């Protein structure tokens, strides 16, 4: 990602495929590689989706919550260190809670994809305007 020439924006939406431990251990290092290569490029951090079925599965809810807390902790640490042009997108309200946003409780339907875009696009637009 850091080798991309003239990027306009980085969107870090890795939380669904990472563990809280991995975010804590290598999240900042990953960010620094990108930031060192492109110090002026905005970076958007996105939380993992809280899927509606998690009200029935405390184990998954706990795992997703831990990962999102780790992501937020990383973001706050970067902000506190003086990082500029970083943005954060919370999971709350991302895809709705009616169960219609996924085909299998994980993968988005067209409606889920639309809701996701509607949720993240305003932050991406703001990041690009400020760049």
Question: How would you describe each model-predicted region?
Answer:
Residues 93-103:
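Short helix/strand-capping connector loops at secondary-structure junctions
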Residues 13-22, 58-65, 103-111:
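The substrate-binding groove and active-site-proximal loops of carbohydrate-active enzymes
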Residues 51-89:
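Substrate-gating cap/lid alpha-helix
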Residues 1-37, 48-54, 100:
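Oxyanion-hole/transition-state-stabilizing segment in secreted/luminal serine hydrolases
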Residues 104-131:
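Histidine-centered active-site loop/cap adjacent to the catalytic His
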């Amino acid at each position: 990602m850091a080798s991309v020439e003239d990027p306009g924006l980085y969107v870090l939406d890795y939380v669904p495929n990472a563990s809280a431990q991995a975010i804590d251990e290598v999240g900042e290092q990953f960010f620094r590689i990108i930031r060192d290569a492109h110090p002026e490029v905005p970076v958007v951090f996105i939380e993992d989706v809280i899927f509606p079925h998690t009200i029935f599965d405390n184990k998954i809810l706990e795992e997703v919550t831990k990962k999102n807390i780790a992501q937020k902790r990383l973001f706050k640490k970067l902000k506190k260190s003086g990082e500029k042009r970083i943005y954060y997108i919370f999971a709350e309200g991302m895809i709705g809670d009616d169960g219609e946003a996924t085909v299998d409780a994980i993968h988005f339907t067209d409606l889920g994809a639309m809701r996701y875009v509607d949720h993240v696009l305003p932050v991406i637009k703001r990041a690009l305007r400020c760049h």
